[in-house]
UniProtKB/Swiss-Prot annotation:
HAMAP family: MatP. Its main location: cytoplasm. It holds the Pfam family MatP. One of its GO terms (biological process) is cell division. One of its GO terms (molecular function) is sequence-specific DNA binding. Belongs to the MatP family. Required for spatial organization of the terminus region of the chromosome (Ter macrodomain) during the cell cycle. Prevents early segregation of duplicated Ter macrodomains during cell division. Binds specifically to matS, which is a 13 bp signature motif repeated within the Ter macrodomain. It is found in: Cytoplasm. Homodimer. Keywords: Cell cycle, Cell division, Cytoplasm, DNA-binding. One of its GO terms (cellular component) is cytoplasm. This is Macrodomain Ter protein.
Length: 148
């Protein structure tokens, strides 16, 4: 296993996941009866700060349809949690209009680079162009002063 398991943290993540599913209207329990579902969900809700109770609840009452989804969600959360600790593995997101993303994507493929590398390349090119323009402006100014 690549990432260390943190029992208390993961119990909290499971609690958050299950409560969110419950609030979305999904049955998180193995029971068909609505009143029993609500009672067990309330029991889970009250055990928020007790990781051992959360794990016990999951073992005894979790819907048979959820263990795989729950494990996948926790595995993804664990990965994001540990990758978020280091600056170079921390992921950031930006909102792009579709047309902009499409142009960037085509340019990336043309340059045989990732999107991140392409953006960095474009920024570097723009910075060097600005530096060149500043040097040219300074040279023009000094030439004008020289010719006066």
């Amino acid at each position: 296993m690549k990432y260390q398991k943190l029992e208390n943290q993961e119990a909290n993540w499971k609690w958050i996941y299950l409560i969110r599913k419950h609030r979305e209207g999904e049955n998180i329990t193995r029971y068909e009866e609505r009143s029993l579902q609500e009672a067990k969900a309330q029991e889970l809700l009250e055990s928020q700060n007790y990781p051992s109770q959360i794990e016990e609840w999951i073992k005894n009452h979790l819907s048979p349809a959820l263990p795989i989804k729950l494990d996948q969600a926790i595995r993804a959360r664990r990965k994001r949690f540990f990758n978020g600790e280091k600056q170079h593995t921390k992921k950031k997101s930006i909102d792009l209009e579709y047309a902009v993303w499409l142009r960037l994507s085509k340019y990336s493929r043309k340059m045989k680079m990732t999107l991140s590398e392409t953006i960095t390349y474009m920024i570097d090119e723009r910075e060097s162009k600005a530096q060149f323009e500043n040097q040219m402006a300074a040279m023009k100014t000094s030439l004008k002063n020289l010719l006066k």
